[in-house]
């Protein structure tokens, strides 16, 4: 499908020597706008796209070309319909309104070109630009609606393509970007305390620990974990798990000794006070007997009661995970051996829960071993992926894991500037429902549950839970984003989105990893630290992800009721919880690092006391760290908010986590006579709020008589009257 040229605007009178100045002005206006535009290719000297856009072109291209004084992409089409393709993993476009770029026909001109924005799985709409002019930079702004990509969840980039089947001379492209939609004057946030979607799990607040961490078993680490509310730990750490032999504390290939042993881990898990523990047994180079002996040592000999055990790490990973089996990275071999692990490990301790490695998507990680395919018994479709093959093998043996293990990293940087890192898109991925990419928590959980149901069926599948034992923004080389406030925002947004799914654990990668300069430090990424690090701390330095985790302990804990609030603007996300003590907490994340957003907050089915507590961490605190301000200014800020009602407004600062804690309003009381010597105390409180009945003889000292969970209606308590009991009250105690 084509669209005529008048729908775009062409500045054909501009000379080809002007685009560098004009593009600079374009970038300046982007920074000053209410919401930042998204650069695709900004003419950087490194020869790559930015914000995760990669060179997927099938024309002859040079991403490090110059023409007329501008850094640009040169494009030569030597055969039919070749294109320069700024490709990307599926991303949402709701925040953007138009594709904007400059194009020059070069010394020959006359090339007929068209533009497309493919969506994963759908044919693209072709938008015809016409023929290019000779040595003239033309400026095009194409509405995303004209490309069929407006408000998409799965845009996979944009290409500029020669519209004929003939060879064409070189042309040039620069300044490609997505123009942002204007931010609303007021964002609307709505919280309904009656809209409960699940109960919070205590395993959501954890960290991976690693054998290379020489500071693991120290008071410093114990205090650090307690300060940020850690409830869950995983050991021994990522891909080393498939090389690690617990009895010696060494890894193989090559044989390496490490700073931290399993006894060291036992100490730290014990010292932080009853942590839930996940242990990853060695599948890649280990044996089921070795794993069973580990269970016996931990839970029988040392009485650790470590409940959760994994069989291997990312054993589907042919390019990174150790696997010495005759058929490495094979789901059938894995399930067959895992069944033996399950039997021997549970023979040592029948109370443990054992997990198997899985992936969303029925065709994910196709190993291509001959004959390995399975038909989905519900849909009748043949699939070749890891999880269907694994589950089918388990079913044949009649032996099943207790949980499936999932790891999620939205980005991957192989090295330097050739990166998928993008601050704006990272902060949109966790709650962007996108079944085609399976990059969000909801899609991943639904896919895993569907596979369990389809391939195992019946009560067997419903008894298997889903657990996340690794999560961070980037699985590759660490760059600026890792240690910036953006990763702290992502940590909170990731957990907030995960809370709305059936995933029952969330373990961040990792506690300590170490600074690195091998990742992406492009100027489009926010931040000031000259290194990246997947950990939350190093030496005496705590990164923004540490403070984000620290803040979350005041937002939600195991047993709380997870609510389902709404926001009408994707860059201001909200998550809400009703705590077991009856308080309501609201976490709001401003994902834009340049703009404050005004919001109207409406609370339904909850009446707050007029004074709330606000805790926050964001750019202001991170800047205090950069400027070496007093330590108190670098930590979570706390203020009182005296305007809490069921409908109020608030301005949320850019790049900041803001947490409201609302106490319930006071109960309404009255009394009436009952039988002689007794009276009825009537009160009306709020649903799910525990109220304490107290009595006093002098209004100075009070004695608690009973605690009652209100149903929201009028409640009656019949009390005996005595000379020593003259006063009664019903209060909420935090």
Residue ranges and their predicted role:
Residues 184-402, 406-408:
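N-terminal catalytic cores of secreted or lumenal carbohydrate-active enzymes
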Residues 606-653:
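Acidic, Ser/Thr/Pro-rich beta/coil linker or hinge segments at domain junctions
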Residues 60-82:
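Short carbohydrate-recognition loop motifs
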Residues 467-556, 560-574, 580:
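Aromatic/acidic polysaccharide-binding cleft in carbohydrate-active enzymes
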Residues 568-610, 614-617, 655-663, 674-675:
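Carbohydrate-binding surface patches
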């Amino acid at each position: 499908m084509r669209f005529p040229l008048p729908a775009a605007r062409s500045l054909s009178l501009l000379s080809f020597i002007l685009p560098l100045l004009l593009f600079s002005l374009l970038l300046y206006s982007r920074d000053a706008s209410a919401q930042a535009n998204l650069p695709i290719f900004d003419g950087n000297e490194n020869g790559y796209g930015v914000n995760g856009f990669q060179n997927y072109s099938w024309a002859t291209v040079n991403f490090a070309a110059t023409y007329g004084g501008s850094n640009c992409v040169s494009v030569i089409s030597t055969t039919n319909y070749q294109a320069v393709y700024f490709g990307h993993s599926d991303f949402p476009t709701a925040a953007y309104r138009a594709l904007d770029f400059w194009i020059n026909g070069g010394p020959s001109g006359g090339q007929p070109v068209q533009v497309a924005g493919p969506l994963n799985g759908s044919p693209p709409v072709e938008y015809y630009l016409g023929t290019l002019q000779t040595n003239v930079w033309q400026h095009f702004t194409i509405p995303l609606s004209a490309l069929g990509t407006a408000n998409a969840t799965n845009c996979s980039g944009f290409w500029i393509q020669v519209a004929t089947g003939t060879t064409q001379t070189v042309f040039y492209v620069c300044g490609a970007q997505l123009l942002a939609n204007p931010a609303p004057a007021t964002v609307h946030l709505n919280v309904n305390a009656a809209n409960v979607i699940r109960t919070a799990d205590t395993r959501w607040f954890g960290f991976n620990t690693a054998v290379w961490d020489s500071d693991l078993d120290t008071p410093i680490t114990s205090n650090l974990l307690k300060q940020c509310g850690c409830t869950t730990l995983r050991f021994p750490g990522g891909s080393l798990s498939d090389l690690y032999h617990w009895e010696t504390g060494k890894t193989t290939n090559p044989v390496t000794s490490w700073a931290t042993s399993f006894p060291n881990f036992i100490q730290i898990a014990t010292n932080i006070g009853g942590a839930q523990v996940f242990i990853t047994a060695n599948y890649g180079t280990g044996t089921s007997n070795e794993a069973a002996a580990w269970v016996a040592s931990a839970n029988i000999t040392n009485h650790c009661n470590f409940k959760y055990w994994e069989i291997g790490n990312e054993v589907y990973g042919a390019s990174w995970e150790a696997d010495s089996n005759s058929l490495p990275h094979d789901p059938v071999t894995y399930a067959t051996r895992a069944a033996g692990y399950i039997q021997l490990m549970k023979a040592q301790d029948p109370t443990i829960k054992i997990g198997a490695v899985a992936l969303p998507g029925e065709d994910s990680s196709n190993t291509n071993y001959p004959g390995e395919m399975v038909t989905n018994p519900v849909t009748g479709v043949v699939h070749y992926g890891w999880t269907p093959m694994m589950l089918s093998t388990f079913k044949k043996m009649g032996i099943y894991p207790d949980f499936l293990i999932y790891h999620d990293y939205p980005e991957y940087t192989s090295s330097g500037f050739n990166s998928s890192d993008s601050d704006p898109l990272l902060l949109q991925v966790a709650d962007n429902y996108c079944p085609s990419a399976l990059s969000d928590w909801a899609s991943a959980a639904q896919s895993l549950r569907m596979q369990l149901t389809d391939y195992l069926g019946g009560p067997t599948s419903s008894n298997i839970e889903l657990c996340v034992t690794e999560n961070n923004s980037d699985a590759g080389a660490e760059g600026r984003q890792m240690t910036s406030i953006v990763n702290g925002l992502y940590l909170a947004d990731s957990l907030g989105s995960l809370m709305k799914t059936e995933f029952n654990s969330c373990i961040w990668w990792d506690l300590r990893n170490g600074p690195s300069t091998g990742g992406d430090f492009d100027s489009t990424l926010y931040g000031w630290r000259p290194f990246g690090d997947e950990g939350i701390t190093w030496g005496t330095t705590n990164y923004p992800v540490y403070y984000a985790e620290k803040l979350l302990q005041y937002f939600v804990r195991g047993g709380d009721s997870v609510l389902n609030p709404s926001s009408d603007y994707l860059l201001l996300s909200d998550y809400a919880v009703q705590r077991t003590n009856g308080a309501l907490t609201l976490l709001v994340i401003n994902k834009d690092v340049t703009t404050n957003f005004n919001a109207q907050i409406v609370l339904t089915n909850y009446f707050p006391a007029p004074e709330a507590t606000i805790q926050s961490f964001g750019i202001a605190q991170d800047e205090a760290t950069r400027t070496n301000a007093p330590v108190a200014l670098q930590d979570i800020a706390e203020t009182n908010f005296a305007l809490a009602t069921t409908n109020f407004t608030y301005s949320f600062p850019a790049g900041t986590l803001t947490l409201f804690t609302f106490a319930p309003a006071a109960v309404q009381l009255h009394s009436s006579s009952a039988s002689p010597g007794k009276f009825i105390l009537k009160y009306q409180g709020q649903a799910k709020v525990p109220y304490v009945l107290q009595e006093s003889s002098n209004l100075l000292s009070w004695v608690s008589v009973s605690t009652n969970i209100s149903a929201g209606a009028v409640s009656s308590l019949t009390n005996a009257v005595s000379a020593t009991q003259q006063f009664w009250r019903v209060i909420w105690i935090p």
